[in-house]
């Protein structure tokens, strides 16, 4: 009997130590959790700059989404597909990346300051801001005019 109690206690310790690994990660109401971050697809068209401003005002550390892996890209694509209403203006969704210099070279970081570790370009053009394209089920990045109003995804 003493052995089964110590085994049960050991399993309880393992369970409690694993419970803090992200399964219980809390996000504000209306946000979705993925890999220790919170995401919100916003169904209100704004220019890239206004969308970035909106995201920074939502929560401390908020920005337009930065996509660091294929898994995160798939999560964001599903989030957008499920939360953005189908209209003529849903062909594109802003992400937090834009061209910063005059030679149209991509900036070396996302709007949140993180490095670019993953890329999924559909084509290179002379427009400065990037978004996800509906035709690719929101999985490929396309250059867009920064002043155009599109839906967007915030991340904290």
UniProtKB/Swiss-Prot annotation:
It is found in: Secreted. One of its GO terms (molecular function) is toxin activity. The keyword Disulfide bond applies. Pfam families: Lectin_C. Keywords: Disulfide bond, Hemostasis impairing toxin, Secreted, Signal, Toxin. SUPFAM superfamilies: C-type lectin-like. Its main location: secreted. Shows greater sequence similarity to the alpha than beta subunits compared to other heterodimer snaclecs. This is Snaclec A11.
């Amino acid at each position: 009997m003493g052995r089964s109690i110590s085994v049960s206690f050991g399993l309880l310790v393992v369970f409690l130590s694993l419970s803090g690994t992200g399964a219980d990660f809390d996000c504000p109401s209306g946000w979705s959790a993925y890999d220790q971050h919170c995401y919100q697809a916003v169904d209100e068209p704004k220019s890239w700059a206004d969308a970035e401003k909106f995201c920074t005002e939502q929560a401390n550390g908020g920005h337009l989404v930065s996509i660091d892996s294929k898994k995160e890209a798939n999560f964001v694509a599903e989030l957008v597909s499920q939360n953005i209403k189908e209209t003529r203006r849903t062909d594109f969704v802003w992400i937090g990346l834009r061209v910063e210099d005059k030679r149209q070279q991509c900036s070396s970081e996302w709007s949140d300051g993180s490095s670019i570790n993953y890329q999924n370009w559909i084509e290179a053009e002379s427009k400065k801001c990037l978004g996800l394209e509906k035709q690719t089920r929101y999985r490929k990045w396309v250059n867009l005019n920064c002043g155009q109003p599109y839906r967007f995804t915030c991340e904290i």
